[in-house]
Amino acid sequence: MSMSHLYGKDEDSDGVEMENFEITDWDLQNEFNPNRRKHFQTKEEATYGMWAERDSDDERPSFGGKRSRDYSAPVNFISAGIRKPAAEEKSDSDSDSETQARRETFPKDFEAKKLRTGGNFKPSQRTFAGGIKSNTDFGSWERHTKGIGQKLLQKMGYVQGRGLGKNAQGIIAPIEAKQRKGKGAVGAYGSERTKQSIKDFPVVDSEEEEEKEFQKEMSQWRKDPGGGKKKPKYSYKTVEELKAKGKVGKSLSAPQKEISQVKVIDMTGREQKVYYSYSQLAHKHNIPGEAPGQGAKEEKPQGFALPELEHNLQLLIDMTEQEIIQNDRQLQYEQDMVVNLTHELEKLSEVLEREEKAIQNLSKVLETVEECERRIQPMCDNPLTLEECARIFEMLQDKYYEEYKMSEKADLSVAIVYPLMKDYFKDWNPLRDPTYGTDVMSKWKNLLEEGHLLSHSAHDASMDPYHRLLWETWVPLLRSIIAQWQPRNCAPMVDFLDCWVHLLPVWILDNILDQLIFPKLQKEVENWNPLTDTVPIHSWIHPWLPLMQSRLEPLFSPIRNKLANALQKWHPSDSSAKLILQPWKEVFTPGSWEAFMVKNILPKLGMCLSEFVINPHQQHMEVFHWVTDWEGMVSLSSIVGILEKHFFPKWLQVLCSWLSNNPNYEEITKWYLGWKSMFSDLVLAHPAIKDKFNEALDIMNRAVSSSVGAYMQPGARESIAYLTQTERRKDFQYEAMQERRDAESIAQRGIGAAAAVPMNFKDLIQSKAEEHNIVFMPLIGKRHEGKQLYNFNRIVIYIDRGVVFVQGEKTWVPTSLQSLIDMAK
């Protein structure tokens, strides 16, 4: 038995080194070792093969390759064994060849990656490249120190026992190794992950990612991964992508607006091309042989190219995509249509419900109206009363308000209410019972009136059932009553209209006053005779002033004419004239009243004063009192004028003649003071009257001072001087007091104006009226075009957007505030 296997079967008995060409375990283990030493075959080895000489320079320390024989080392024995017979070796070689064939069919990455060791020696005897030996005591000095790394980590805030990172999120324990149970491949015994790995990396790759990684590793062992026949790449488009494209893109089937006669020159290709519309340019296809654009990579020449077929296929694809898009749009349109129709159906259902409810309500209203019509028939057993009819209308207004407002209330009231209303007022006498029916009419006003309160014409009122009710049932009855009424008995008629003024529309009240009342008054004024009638005219004219106001102005002129004719033969001794004229002072305008006084009264008063005899010894004062009684009726200037003209010349003449005959100055003083007391303070304050009395004092002083050497009553001079001084002091005190009063009134007026500034134009007019003592008050129930009418001292006005309008003969005339005040005075 040969013992060669104890020394290695690669050596013969002569000690010659032999190299076997069989695949050993080392070859399999280092097949995929990238760090093994690669031996490139030289030219000499290729020529001589195994007989080629080796160069000693090639033998250099390395990690791989066959180590050179070291004869200085002791003999290494291998474990003993039994050499197999030739048959078994052959079978083993066959199995080895099969194993090698199987290994060639798998990629290199699936081989075990083990570094080749230098031979059968201990790990402690192995050396690295460069002759460096591996020693287990290498770096043993680190056992007694922390090292520079530990110091640097502690300087940066590292705490031992915690992980690295800002939030200590690093791992604490080092990476653990898990020993595999057997010698099987990776994953043969299940998952090999440690608890730390599962904790730090809980996410596991999916099977698809593992499959991709597997395919990628499989492709690494191919000879030419980039060469060979490539599989065609398919581009898939989902329906959702096509829908999204259809929302922003244009439809292919939609008609394109082409601009006619547009010449488009395409110079993007190898040669110039001309198109006659932009659509042709958009639908051009690639032509074989065209040069690629600049910067494009040259593609491999195609052996089989059909551009027409490609164009047709692309067109079919586009048409299919467009059909999908159109179907999606049609589906969306139909869905929107369904939603719209649903909303329309809901709206129509609501309308239908409302209409059905309206039909039911109208049916009930119709039944109620028919019942009312049946009960107003003459032969009805249960006749309808006006109160029951009012309750029925209230019920219709409360329960069926919409139908009640939409119905023709005028026709309904004409058919039902008018007969009942005529029957209700058939026996009524408004002059005896003016308040009869006011409560009933007030209720029907709320039921029938539609808000035409400011209407001024019968045409507008015909559209209002309440106005029509009054016009056709109430006004005819009133006409018959007024036709029999005597204007001199005005109190019952005035009371009647005062009770009904708040129930009457403006145009009906105007019609009553203008067409019924005023003609009766005008006719009665024409028949009036102030000389024979015992009833004063103001007693039956003035009660109409609050209702008619400016409507009575046409009557004032004939009244003044009749009064002037009656005063032609009048004498101031007759005091009845004053009683007749005094009520008209506030009715006539100031100008017309003053003109009437100057023409008819002042001449009579002046004639009386001219005939008045002044006798200091026996004075009769009746004539003088006749004149002074008219002081409040005649203006102050007119009174002063007739006194200056007819009284003071005679009075001063009597004084002078008395002083020239050695008078008793005490009696003269009393006579002077007695005549002065006969005048009112208002007359005495007039400058002309003051001058006349001062002139009398001057005459008396001259008379006293000129009597030098003649007999003079003792104390006369001092008495006259004292009288003069006293009278002058009284005049001065009166003037000072008057100035003080004027200053106080001006100051109070200024304070009041500053304290209470008018908020609007109406307040300003009111303040001006108070300053000038003018009556400013609203007229009850009087409006013009919706504006409240006011009485400004017998002048009718209304205010519209800060402008005052005054009633003229035919129209309303705008005027200023100062002009209005002048007209009122």
Swiss-Prot record:
Bridged cysteine pairs (disulfide): none
InterPro entries associated with the record: G_patch_dom, GCFC_dom, STIP/TFIP11_N, TFP11, TFP11/STIP/Ntr1
Record-stated family: Belongs to the TFP11/STIP family.
GO CC annotations, alphabetized: spliceosomal complex
Function: Involved in pre-mRNA splicing, specifically in spliceosome disassembly during late-stage splicing events.
Chain intervals for the UniProt region annotation (Disordered): 1-135
Gene, per the UniProt record: tfip11
Highest taxon in the source lineage: Eukaryota
Keyword annotations: mRNA processing, mRNA splicing, Nucleus, Spliceosome
Compositional bias (Acidic residues): 11-25
One GO process term, biological-process aspect: spliceosomal complex disassembly
Protein name: Tuftelin-interacting protein 11
Signal peptide start-end: none
Biased composition (Polar residues): 122-135
Residues of the G-patch domain: 145-191
Subcellular location: Nucleus
Assembly and oligomerization: Identified in the spliceosome C complex.
A GO MF label: nucleic acid binding
